[in-house]
Amino acid sequence: MITLEKGITRAGTGYAGKTWNILGQLYFPKAVTDSTFAFETNSEPGQFVPVHVHPTQDEFILVQEGVLDLKLDGVWVKAHAGDLVRMPRGIPHGCFNKSDKPARALFWVSPMQKLEALFNMLDNLADPAEVVRISAEHEVNFLPPEAND
């Protein structure tokens, strides 16, 4: 069982000094417990996470800087700094930085399930097909590429 430790995870750093590079995007874990997993992302212009589904987790995004284009259950929407995006489990969603400026956001899922283990395995992995395969083993299912249109 993973319990929450008191303290502060500083801006631009990850919990316990950890950082993941997942296909060029930097992820910083902020809080890790059995019930919740929170992480910060920094997305450069053009970076994205393709449409996928978390069948066993609810997910949230608090946009902290910039604008994110999201495809939520087949519909395109924009989230600006200060906006909170709510994504119930089972809803297809993808996150895209289509702007010409960096975006920063705090993501969290509940419960954690296998997401931290997945990010540990994806760190510095360069093959997108392998990312998709490993993700499916950790309860994150990517949709076919046309779902991103």
Model-predicted segments: where are they?
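A short, N-terminal "cap"/entry segment at the start of jelly-roll beta-barrel domains
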Residues: 1-37, 124-149
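A hydrophobic/aromatic-rich effector-binding and dimerization subdomain
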Residues: 108-128
